[in-house]
Amino acid sequence: NQKNHAADVSPTASQMPKLVGLAQASRIYRNLSTKNSSKFSNNGNEIAWGTIGNASTSEGVFFEAINAAGVLQIPMVISVWDDDYGISVHNKDQTTKESISKSLKGFQKTDNQPGLEIIEVKGWDYTALIDAYSYASKLARNDHIPVMVHVTELTQPLGHSSSGSHERYKTTERLEWEKKHDCNLKMKEWILSNGIANHDDLELIEKNAKILVKNERMSAWNEYQKPILKQREIFYNFYNDFIDKTNNDINLQLIKKELVSNTEPCYNDIISSARKSQYILSKFPNINSKKFKKWLNNLKSEIEEKVSSNLYSYNLDFYNKIEITPLEYDENPKIVDGRIIIRDNFEALLSKHDNLLIFGEDVGKIGDVNQGLEGLQEKFGKIRITDTGIREATIVGQGIGLALRGFRPIAEIQYLDYILYCIQILSDDLASLNYRTNAQQIAPLIIRTRGHRLEGIWHSGSPMAGMIHLLRGIHIIVPRNMTQAAGFYNFLMTIQQPAIVIEPLNGYRLKEKLPNNLGDYTIKPGEIEILKKGEDITIISYGSTLRLVQEASKKLLNNGISVEVIDIQTLIPFDTNKNIFKSINKTNNLLIVDEDVPGGASAYILQQLLEKQNIFKHLDSKPVLLSAKSHRPAYGSDGDYFSKPSFDDIYDAVYNIMHDQNPNKFPRV
């Protein structure tokens, strides 16, 4: 009977995808026993309750979620609060037939076909609401039938927000109707008509409730203000000491005057006043402001920690303490397609973790489009290896909800291009979940996808900068081959951190050595790998392009140029031990090769190196960024050659850097 709350999200309809996963967990728990099932479910009897406004049902993810719920037959009850408007826009301009329940009739279950149950009820009719929700609850809990309760004739007493009255867009007749059908008024009428209480009793309850709320509000605000006012007093004490020593400096007086006038200060008001004061104090060398600076820095750090902590589940210290399990090979290892390594590694993980679920488009019956899950549905069953429809936002939503309820889901987004369909849910919900709940809720969802270079305009892009900037809070992992990808999956299964693993799309048929400890060896996010040591220049890259970098580095050696090749491996986190700095400190030259657009991931990489690793003063030449073109890759081999960094582009870029430093040894070509 425990009630749980999943952190909400404000963007309209964004709660819907996760709701699918929360409800699906109950269905799975009813049919699949795992080691820790009892911690998360009572035989799948839990209902996932959700709410949405009538106007938000026009969002695509609402329809996607409704369709998914009907297909999956999950215990989800969604309430649609309908007041006829979406801010100022009437239902006739929002919804077909001016009614979401009428619009969705095709989804409604029949005697012969499963679907949703759709119930329509008036929001001011108390007894009808009880009947409606009792029926909805019974259907969902007992039979795992999704239900939509369309609650109509609701009112909007104050309009959508404080930015403007609803009198601007509602007719006089509508406003009058709302006064008569206000839910509180109708509830009062029902209580009086049934003799439950008299008018005086209700008036007293209403009066006392208002007093209680006002008192509690003031009490909460005073408690919140206490530590802030204490810090302001500390600032005043410093000020009183400084004002005499600065001959009553007028600028210092103005700073205090402004702060005193603020009757309800925030921390930023105090800290801002203190920071401004530092510049005034710097003009008086006789003043010892060490204690003041220490107090200011401590307070600033304390508040920054409160505001900025828990974006990720773990900090750097935690990762540094984790021991990795190294790769192991037989003396004469088999040479196999990369897909075999990823497939057999998933098989090992599924055997090891009974709460691991893998789902997505085409992952079940055919074992994914590149055969990385071949035969695993047959071995582990349809509950654990599941095909889904083409609906990326709710695939991610399933993963978030399932992860919140104790499963370890790997949700497959078939191609990196398709991340755009679910980027909003990934950004607004998954990436920010740990942060916005202050680590009280976490969804360790792993997104499996594939991408990078391929010939053609689709399935060949590498929009890494978009992901890096929109998905802070999620690890972005970019392995160069399937052996590395498997090691990252193994590591991620040992921690509680959401991540996206982008397998190289053109690598499934390339040959790799078969490890003998699949499912066990681990590769830690944030650690680079030096693929080739060198002395003259450092080239850093990731993913598919590394093969071209390695090929070019061999040819460059024939021309007397020694290249150090580094695989970044993960963009977030990025080189946590600052090992790239050590390489640049040795070679003093840098080339970043990236198949994202100009100013994309390469700019992020350079920012990390300049600001966090301080490489600038160790460079003998300007860092060079070699990226793809701004457009999508064109079709055919020529399209690939002229759209993405090629072997020749890499060779030329390195040669030109060396020419600038030693034109006699490396004459211009």
Where are these regions (language model features)?
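Secondary-structure transition/capping motifs at alpha-helix termini
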Residues: 29-32, 42-43, 69-77, 107-114, ...
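Alpha-helical segments flanking ligand/cofactor-binding loops in enzyme cores
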Residues: 67, 397-400, 490, 554, ...
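Short beta-strand segments
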Residues: 13, 51-52, 78-82, 150-155, ...
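Short glycine/serine/threonine-rich phosphate/pyrophosphate-binding segments
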Residues: 15, 19, 57-65, 87, ...
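Phosphate/pyrophosphate-binding betaalpha-module
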Residues: 11-13, 17-19, 24-135, 440, ...
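Thiamine diphosphate
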Residues: 1-49, 80-498, 502, 505-669, ...
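Short hydrophobic alpha-helical runs that function as membrane-insertion/retention elements
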Residues: 75-80, 118-119, 385-387, 409-412, ...
